[in-house]
Amino acid sequence: MEQMEVDVDMSAKPSTSSSAAAGSSMAVDKTADQNPQPQGNIMAAAGTSGSVTISLHPLVIMNISEHWTRFRAQHGEPRQVYGALIGKQKGRNIEIMNSFELKTDVIGDETVINKDYYNKKEQQYKQVFSDLDFIGWYTTGDNPTADDIKIQRQIAAINECPIMLQLNPLSRSVDHLPLKLFESLIDLVDGEATMLFVPLTYTLATEEAERIGVDHVARMTSNESGEKSVVAEHLVAQDSAIKMLNTRIKIVLQYIRDVEAGKLRANQEILREAYALCHRLPVMQVPAFQEEFYTQCNDVGLISYLGTLTKGCNDMHHFVNKFNMLYDRQGSARRMRGLYY
């Protein structure tokens, strides 16, 4: 049986056993009600090491980034977001595989997790991912704060040892991922039981579908900051080429006009090149090109028409199914009435 290890300074760290964790949680809640935690005491001592190893999937990072970006677009300013982490835990090895959003309510100056919303979302995810369990929670920001400690206490009522993941979407660093992972422990600070964060190390674990998605995202960015996509870069290059072509054509046209007006001497080599340039486009007016062009237009129109017909058939199929369902219900009702008369 696992037991809680008690140091000489009476600092206790919650173990994985349910009885020990329940006792620790009750002690933490009782102490928090009597003596609020000091604002400056958030991180554990530098020599404190984590008790678990984390394997993080890229899908979680993309979910958090999408959540924060969507909230920023909706509200017009960056806002701190919260969500739940789900995955698998085997002993001291934790694999964070997915995540979902959490609804929060602001009561006074404190943020409170909506437990009803969490329970509803957990049931929905359990129906699809029955082998995934609640691991912890995520938020956004640069460093943990006292408010994060309060959220950690709330999450501890759901999971005895929750993991906190903090992502900084505003970071410009390209050397490493702007995220941190923490677990919590209870220690005595100035004679008071205090919840502190302990940094955790992590490794990235990917599956085939995630590797394809991450590779697609990486290819769609033209620089490390991700400000321009490949499509935008391609369009910019085309725009520059068209502008340059337009400028050169205007120069050639102005030269020919000046030669006709007698302002410049005629250069036969330049005139021959201009003549050859003007006769490049009419070459495409040959009957073979026209035939292929119209054939391709007909093919495109036929494909569009087939798509419209397919959509119409699909709508008709749904309509017939609903009609048959309604007809069967009415027939059953008539048969039931016939039994009583």
UniProtKB/Swiss-Prot annotation:
<keyword id="KW-0963">Cytoplasm</keyword>
<feature type="region of interest" description="Disordered">
    <location>
        <begin position="1"/>
        <end position="43"/>
    </location>
</feature>
<dbReference type="Pfam" id="PF01398">
    <property type="entry name" value="JAB"/>
</dbReference>
<dbReference type="GO" id="GO:0008180">
    <property type="term" value="C:COP9 signalosome"/>
</dbReference>
<dbReference type="GO" id="GO:0007281">
    <property type="term" value="P:germ cell development"/>
</dbReference>
<comment type="subunit">
    <text>Component of the CSN complex, probably composed of CSN1b, alien/CSN2, CSN3, CSN4, CSN5, CSN6, CSN7 and CSN8.</text>
</comment>
<comment type="function">
    <text>Component of the COP9 signalosome complex (CSN), a complex involved in various cellular and developmental processes. The CSN complex is an essential regulator of the ubiquitin (Ubl) conjugation pathway by mediating the deneddylation of the cullin subunits of the SCF-type E3 ligase complexes, leading to decrease the Ubl ligase activity of SCF. The CSN complex plays an essential role in oogenesis and embryogenesis and is required for proper photoreceptor R cell differentiation and promote lamina glial cell migration or axon targeting.</text>
</comment>
<keyword id="KW-0539">Nucleus</keyword>
<keyword id="KW-0896">Oogenesis</keyword>
<dbReference type="InterPro" id="IPR033859">
    <property type="entry name" value="MPN_CSN6"/>
</dbReference>
<dbReference type="GO" id="GO:0000338">
    <property type="term" value="P:protein deneddylation"/>
</dbReference>
<dbReference type="InterPro" id="IPR037518">
    <property type="entry name" value="MPN"/>
</dbReference>
<protein>
    <recommendedName>
        <fullName>COP9 signalosome complex subunit 6</fullName>
    </recommendedName>
</protein>
<dbReference type="GO" id="GO:0036099">
    <property type="term" value="P:female germ-line stem cell population maintenance"/>
</dbReference>
<feature type="domain" description="MPN">
    <location>
        <begin position="54"/>
        <end position="188"/>
    </location>
</feature>
<dbReference type="GO" id="GO:0042802">
    <property type="term" value="F:identical protein binding"/>
</dbReference>
<dbReference type="GO" id="GO:0048477">
    <property type="term" value="P:oogenesis"/>
</dbReference>
<feature type="compositionally biased region" description="Low complexity">
    <location>
        <begin position="11"/>
        <end position="27"/>
    </location>
</feature>
<dbReference type="GO" id="GO:0005737">
    <property type="term" value="C:cytoplasm"/>
</dbReference>
<keyword id="KW-0736">Signalosome</keyword>
<dbReference type="InterPro" id="IPR000555">
    <property type="entry name" value="JAMM/MPN+_dom"/>
</dbReference>
<dbReference type="GO" id="GO:0050821">
    <property type="term" value="P:protein stabilization"/>
</dbReference>
<dbReference type="Pfam" id="PF13012">
    <property type="entry name" value="MitMem_reg"/>
</dbReference>
<keyword id="KW-0221">Differentiation</keyword>
<dbReference type="InterPro" id="IPR024969">
    <property type="entry name" value="EIF3F/CSN6-like_C"/>
</dbReference>
<dbReference type="GO" id="GO:0048140">
    <property type="term" value="P:male germ-line cyst encapsulation"/>
</dbReference>
<comment type="similarity">
    <text>Belongs to the peptidase M67A family. CSN6 subfamily.</text>
</comment>
<keyword id="KW-0217">Developmental protein</keyword>
